[in-house]
Amino acid sequence: MRRSAAPSQVQGKSFKKTRFIPPGRSNADVSKEITKMSPDPKLFQGAEQSQNDPGVCSSNPCPSEGIPREVGDGTRVDPLPPVHSASKEITESKAQEEEASSLLKYFSVVWCKASKKKHKKWEGDAILIVRGRSFTLKDLEGKDIGRGIGYKFKDLENVEEGQTLIIGGKEIEILGTISSDDFNSGKCFQHGSGSPAVPSSQAARKCFSNPFKSVCQSTQAQGKRWNDCRPRHNPCTPNALVMPRPDENHQRMFNRHCSPIVDVVIDPHLVHHLRPHQKDGIIFLYECVMGMRAVGKCGAILADEMGLGKTLQCISLIWTLQCQGPYGGKPVIKKTLIVTPGSLVNNWRKEFQKWLGSERIKIFTVDQDHKVEEFINSTFHSVLIISYEMLLRSLDQIKTIPFGLLICDEGHRLKNSSIKTTTALSSLSCEKTVILTGTPVQNDLQEFFALVDFVNPGILGSLSSYRKIYEEPIIISREPSSSKEERELGERRATELTRLTGRFILRRTQEVINKYLPPKIENVVFCRPGALQIELYRKLLRSQSVRFCLQGLLENSAHLICIGALKKLCNHPCLLFSSVKGKEFSSSCEENEERNLCQGLLSVFPAGYNPLQFSEEESGKLQVLVKLLAVIHELRPTEKVILVSNYRQTLNVLEEVCKRHGYACARLDGQTPVSQRQHIVDSFNSKYSTDFIFLLSSKAGGVGLNLIGGSHLILYDIDWNPATDIQAMSRVWRDGQKHPVHIYRLLTTGTIEEKIYQRQISKQGLSGAVVDLTRSSEHIQFSVEELKNLFTLHESSHCVTHDLLDCECTGEKGHTEDASEGPVASRQCQFGPQKSDALRPLSMSQLKQWKHFSGDHLNLPDPFLERIRENVSFFFQNITNQAPAV
């Protein structure tokens, strides 16, 4: 007996899988009647005669149903029941199935666990995907939470708003339809998509009106005060840079005292030095930190490439916000915190002094002699500049300071939300946040999410939803084996991610300032390995540790040890010798693994080998470097060289080479005191400097430094992270450079360095998919399969990277002969315009458009390359701002 007055089934009619009913009538009596009837030959004979007899009337060729008829000898026969054509029914059902399979609809729904309760308690929003005869239910994080299959096409076609369904143990109610564009772009997964509405409490808020009006106090005082609210600078003067005025929604949220709107004008002293792209950047930053671009969010990422003046744009923003405001002219902030790498603390102080002098604004830099407590007790310092390391030490004191603006220079180091630095900065109660970085996407899209979530928490949802909705479709679409549907979905998701983040991320490339800079000649130089290097490389690849790594029998640390040993060998065998000798009598587990890797290597070295008295001929890259330094010193005696490495031990070798050849050099690495670094840089940039070479550690000083005193930069080794190398190479080609810039990247041919370089290109393509999406060109993408082969020595190739390009140019000796032998079977690992119609990602170097030269090429156009060709197997060259003579 039913106890509830509720209907036994929800009005929406939950779908149930019905019993199968064959086509046609299913009346039992009719079927028996048909079975009992025996076929009469006369019946068919009469039918044939009626068809062939021209005298028979054709107006009614078939007898009517239910009317008795005579056949042959006049016998009356009962009417035949209507029999449906089986072939027609099957054809119609197949057509319906095909139509159902092509059916694809999307709905926004609410869901809860299936129950018989009359009043449902919905647990959350979801997306219903109707595909063919199946349902898929996804939550707003992109996870599948329910599936159903086997529904009728008629039921699927009639799904409408307000209907309730049961799917996978969950009851849902249809709220509305979603367009395919919104689903493919991912907009439907966004919480509160569209322009955020102003809360009713804020929209209804009015200015406080005191009901009692004093007869002694005149209202003229307040009116006079408001009349005195004038812009700090005249907005009507020529070339005045005026910030946008807040709209009505912004005024409801932030102008609680109904103050008059005042124009915010950038100081004309700064505007005089600003370039057009810098003016646009200041307006962008102002709108972001004031909450005008993303309602309720006051963060921004200035992702301009190196050399575009991010520091000057931030200084202009700070000075403006500390002096002006749109509501009654009241300053927006009082104090600013700038967090930067240790080597750039004094550089920021110099930039403030350069653009604003020492009287307009007071800057406090934290170092060993100046503590945070002094800033707390100071009444006239308004900007605190501190390194990331000192921030962690002084976090408790900094938390007590009410900063209105936080600026994180070289903010790509915040790519991991779980590290101490990111956690410490997130604990500060500072609503307005700006990240400065030239490389917003370094390795993967999760690092990009960490940066975005730091400046504007929650704007992309949770990390799990971000992975499902954006990261996975984008990465899958960039694989060479992806389907057309996957590529289209990934492209739409990347476009939507760019649109979302474009509200608070500004990215400009160096193309905007090319006209202000001298020519830049970039060269990727592939150096032939020395005989000792080849012999040691073979020995390492045959070692037990490498074989176990390839079989997956060792832990991850063993992989890193093998890679580290190969990288040391590529720089110089003496570095590997010192490492092997140092681990010979070690006892720790990690050092035992390295000792096992290097067993038998000492026997390959010459007897009595001394790493301190190394030979330049033992390393292919070192031979090229020595010749390159000699030709630069000969042809450009007044120009200087920056020599960059990732490792201090390698810098020691390079410093010894400089001493042998009598080159005066300066050095900046991790052991250089922070207080002395800016002085070393200034001395090298001075025209009175006698140093020919600047030895630079990319880890300690590869970011933010301005080394325009040198015009030749040589990157001796390569890093897994492309941002490290890009930052280091950007130290010389920037504002203030007077000479043509020459950049050389040295790689050992056929070794692990080429594989690392190829992975760098792949990672840069990922950055282009999101941040630089507006660029369009035919670019190459290396397959994952080609990049897995790290532990291989390609001795017969002049350049493995050029081989992967599938380029038919004559740069490589014998390449055209190989290409003319016949068509080669297409594989997923091959590249070129003819291989795939997919939208290829943007690469760092656009190698297809670069010039390709073999080391055996006759008459190289570059005089520097011509002199070092003896030890080089291949060149890639690209010239920016090409001039008649470089």
Swiss-Prot record:
<dbReference type="GO" id="GO:0000724">
    <property type="term" value="P:double-strand break repair via homologous recombination"/>
</dbReference>
<dbReference type="GO" id="GO:0005524">
    <property type="term" value="F:ATP binding"/>
</dbReference>
<feature type="binding site">
    <location>
        <begin position="304"/>
        <end position="311"/>
    </location>
    <ligand>
        <name>ATP</name>
    </ligand>
</feature>
<protein>
    <recommendedName>
        <fullName>DNA repair and recombination protein RAD54B</fullName>
        <ecNumber>3.6.4.-</ecNumber>
    </recommendedName>
</protein>
<dbReference type="GO" id="GO:0016787">
    <property type="term" value="F:hydrolase activity"/>
</dbReference>
<feature type="compositionally biased region" description="Basic and acidic residues">
    <location>
        <begin position="67"/>
        <end position="76"/>
    </location>
</feature>
<dbReference type="InterPro" id="IPR050496">
    <property type="entry name" value="SNF2_RAD54_helicase_repair"/>
</dbReference>
<dbReference type="GO" id="GO:0003677">
    <property type="term" value="F:DNA binding"/>
</dbReference>
<dbReference type="InterPro" id="IPR049730">
    <property type="entry name" value="SNF2/RAD54-like_C"/>
</dbReference>
<dbReference type="InterPro" id="IPR027417">
    <property type="entry name" value="P-loop_NTPase"/>
</dbReference>
<dbReference type="GO" id="GO:0008340">
    <property type="term" value="P:determination of adult lifespan"/>
</dbReference>
<dbReference type="GO" id="GO:0006974">
    <property type="term" value="P:DNA damage response"/>
</dbReference>
<keyword id="KW-0227">DNA damage</keyword>
<dbReference type="GO" id="GO:0009410">
    <property type="term" value="P:response to xenobiotic stimulus"/>
</dbReference>
<feature type="compositionally biased region" description="Polar residues">
    <location>
        <begin position="1"/>
        <end position="12"/>
    </location>
</feature>
<dbReference type="InterPro" id="IPR001650">
    <property type="entry name" value="Helicase_C-like"/>
</dbReference>
<dbReference type="GO" id="GO:0005634">
    <property type="term" value="C:nucleus"/>
</dbReference>
<keyword id="KW-0234">DNA repair</keyword>
<feature type="compositionally biased region" description="Polar residues">
    <location>
        <begin position="47"/>
        <end position="62"/>
    </location>
</feature>
<feature type="region of interest" description="Disordered">
    <location>
        <begin position="1"/>
        <end position="95"/>
    </location>
</feature>
<comment type="subunit">
    <text>Interacts with RAD51 through the NH2-terminal domain.</text>
</comment>
<dbReference type="InterPro" id="IPR000330">
    <property type="entry name" value="SNF2_N"/>
</dbReference>
<feature type="modified residue" description="Phosphoserine">
    <location>
        <position position="14"/>
    </location>
</feature>
<keyword id="KW-0067">ATP-binding</keyword>
<comment type="similarity">
    <text>Belongs to the SNF2/RAD54 helicase family.</text>
</comment>
<dbReference type="GO" id="GO:0015616">
    <property type="term" value="F:DNA translocase activity"/>
</dbReference>
<dbReference type="InterPro" id="IPR014001">
    <property type="entry name" value="Helicase_ATP-bd"/>
</dbReference>
<keyword id="KW-0347">Helicase</keyword>
<keyword id="KW-0238">DNA-binding</keyword>
<feature type="domain" description="Helicase ATP-binding">
    <location>
        <begin position="291"/>
        <end position="458"/>
    </location>
</feature>
<dbReference type="GO" id="GO:0004386">
    <property type="term" value="F:helicase activity"/>
</dbReference>
<keyword id="KW-0597">Phosphoprotein</keyword>
<dbReference type="GO" id="GO:0010212">
    <property type="term" value="P:response to ionizing radiation"/>
</dbReference>
<feature type="domain" description="Helicase C-terminal">
    <location>
        <begin position="627"/>
        <end position="788"/>
    </location>
</feature>
<keyword id="KW-0539">Nucleus</keyword>
<dbReference type="Pfam" id="PF00176">
    <property type="entry name" value="SNF2-rel_dom"/>
</dbReference>
<feature type="short sequence motif" description="DEGH box">
    <location>
        <begin position="409"/>
        <end position="412"/>
    </location>
</feature>
<keyword id="KW-0378">Hydrolase</keyword>
<comment type="function">
    <text>Involved in DNA repair and mitotic recombination. May play an active role in recombination processes in concert with other members of the RAD52 epistasis group.</text>
</comment>
<dbReference type="Pfam" id="PF00271">
    <property type="entry name" value="Helicase_C"/>
</dbReference>
<dbReference type="InterPro" id="IPR038718">
    <property type="entry name" value="SNF2-like_sf"/>
</dbReference>
<keyword id="KW-0547">Nucleotide-binding</keyword>
